[in-house]
């Protein structure tokens, strides 16, 4: 693997992720077993020397990152908070101070998109957290992405004005998104993606584009946790 556990810790990999990945290298049937036993961890696996590869194995960082995303996405917000702040305290003290200034606020951020059948898998290593969630903190907010020039400034400004005028903190997700769809339709953007895909030339864009305008304005990024 070319590195010891301290190196992987410094890079931000959780020990659980590294151990999980190593098991996929050591025993050819580990992944199949884990799919059949999703609630168990590598310590429960019936390891067999007979299942070890006789030709050795190649380390693959891409596969490690995939495994790590699965591991971190399956953690609770509390577990992610503990792992992230523990890593940051040693390797990014300034970030650790921001994270721990208001633990409940940080945990509420980490809870976004977590749980359910399809949890978000944005984090592969703890060091991914700052660029991913930094916009929630004044110290780290920065506009890193811009709205493509193919969209008119007038449309963008109209969307943002409409969003501000209609925003109500008490709205649930469905009401919130319905308002965005109405803004889109009023400006000639398709409110329904199926309708847009069937005849894209009939619209100025889609509700996905309108949502992107809002996302970039609020977060400075094209990719972020769920805006709602």
Located regions from the model:
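Short, functional N-terminal and low-complexity linear motifs
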Residues: 47-54, 143-148, 166-167, 206-213
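Charged substrate- and nucleic-acid-binding regions of tRNA-handling and nucleotidyl-transfer enzymes
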Residues: 178-228
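Amphipathic alpha-helical segments within well-ordered protein domains
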Residues: 5-6, 65-68, 85, 161-164, ...
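A diffuse structural propensity rather than consistent per-protein peaks
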Residues: 4, 48, 60, 125, ...
